[in-house]
Structures are given as structure tokens and as C-alpha cells.
Amino acid sequence: MNKQRGTYSEVSLAQDPKRQQRKLKGNKSSISGTKQEIFQVELNLQNASSDHQGNDKTYHCKGLLPPPERLTAEVLGIICIVLMATVLKTIVLIPCIGVLEQNNFSLNRRMQKACDCGHCPEEWITYSNSCYYIGKERRTWEEGVCWPVLQRTLICFL
């Protein structure tokens, strides 16, 4: 829209408005009436269609970013928000992890002191801090009941 020209005219008529006619500057027809306001704009739009098709860098809204720059700004904004969330999460979680590690270490120590059981003898199986023996020898029932007492253990009936 390179060439724009506007003409503003106000027509005030005398007491007999039906008879008065006045020609406006730049207008070839006469107008009659009590009071009329006329706004004439002549636009020279010779290159208007070619301006919109060929010139993609001209934007009429100055407050908005063009699509490629806007997309880039949105992506960078999202990346910034994700990075800030990660940093904040790290700042909050690092002290918590340290406290949990200390608690875990002290709990393991207390369990080792409370359990204070030695290793199981050879051919015995450890399960849940207990030792189990599965014998392959043939014994009578009385021998099978007496054998754990001799070993200072308890018998488990299955």
C-alpha cells in the first residue's frame, strides 16, 4: 500500500436543503442534503497483489513474530522450562538422597548387629538368615528326631 490519498469534506447546507447543491473537490457528482460528511479515499493498489505474494518478510502486525521465529522462541522456551525443572528437582533431591543413604547404612549396621549369626555349616542352606539342612541319609524316625538335638538345631517337619 504505497500510495494512499484521502479527502475529507463536510457539506453544510443552508435553510432550504432541497435546493442547495454543492460539488465536492475530487468528486464529479453533486450531493444534496441537510448535513453530510463525505470521506473519500483513493487507493492506488497497482502493486498490492504482487507485494503480498512476493514479499514474505513484510508483516503487518509488528507485535507478533513471524512463524519461523515464533516456533524457535516457543521451542527454546519449552527447553528452558524443562532445564529449570530439572535443576530444581536435582537441588531438592540431592539432600534427600544423602539422608536416605545415611539411614540405609545405619539400618544395615543395626541389622548386622542384631542378626549376629555365624555362617551355616557345610552342606547347609541359608534362607532368610536361617540355616537349613536337607539330609540324604536314611534314618529311623527316632534317629531323625534325635539328630537335630545332637546338632543343637531344631527339626522342621514338612
UniProtKB/Swiss-Prot annotation:
GO biological process, one term: positive regulation of natural killer cell mediated cytotoxicity
Subcellular location(s) per record: Membrane
Keywords, in A-Z order: Disulfide bond, Membrane, Receptor, Signal-anchor, Transmembrane, Transmembrane helix
GO MF annotation terms: transmembrane signaling receptor activity
Annotated membrane topology: Single-pass type II membrane protein
Membrane topology, Extracellular segments: 96-158
Entry-linked InterPro entries: C-type_lectin-like/link_sf, CTDL_fold, NKG2/CD94_NK_receptors
Ranges in the topological domain labelled Cytoplasmic: 1-74
Alphabetized PANTHER family for the sequence: C-TYPE LECTIN PROTEINS, NKG2-F TYPE II INTEGRAL MEMBRANE PROTEIN
This protein's name: NKG2-F type II integral membrane protein
Organism: Pan troglodytes (Chimpanzee)
